[in-house]
Swiss-Prot record:
This is Putative pre-16S rRNA nuclease. Transmembrane segments: none annotated. Pfam families: RuvX. Could be a nuclease involved in processing of the 5'-end of pre-16S rRNA. Keywords: Cytoplasm, Hydrolase, Nuclease, Ribosome biogenesis.
């Protein structure tokens, strides 16, 4: 089974893809859109995924606080998921995204990527971290 991971932000959507059989994730792209305009975002996501020749499931990063309570952005992501489910028939898996942006940023720093370039890459790399973490998590069948 193939998977498409999404890191949802108020202005960007980081996307990673991966193969559950081999448990390998890859950063794919970033969609930029007007703040909170998830309809615009989904239209662009449809264009990006239209060329995929395989069935896939979505893995959506869900932000939570350290104590597992809802964060300030949880509601925004929940609203995005509602729209996604209304526009796609694909299964949606919700996965904890705690620290993914921090991990992604550290990966870029460790690879000596300059700050300006890090900003361009952080969202798709965060989606990659979400998907690779999902693949590495034995609680989820692939």
């Amino acid at each position: 089974m193939y998977y498409v991971a999404l890191d949802v932000g108020s202005r960007t959507l980081g996307i990673a893809t991966g193969d559950g059989e081999f448990k390998i994730a890859s950063p794919y792209c970033v969609i930029s859109f007007n703040q909170y305009d998830f309809r615009q975002c989904l239209a662009e996501l449809k264009e990006k995924t239209a060329s995929f020749f395989y069935d896939f499931k979505f893995v959506i990063g869900m932000p939570k606080n350290i104590d597992q309570t809802k964060s300030s952005t949880t509601e925004m992501v929940e609203n995005f998921i509602e729209l996604l489910k209304a526009n796609y028939k694909n299964e949606v898996i919700i996965y904890d995204e705690s620290y993914t942006s921090i991990i992604a940023d550290q990966l870029l720093i460790d690879n000596q990527i300059k700050a300006k370039k890090r900003k361009e890459k952080i969202d798709k790399l965060a989606a990659f971290v979400i998907l690779q973490s999902f693949f590495d998590d034995d609680r989820y069948p692939k």
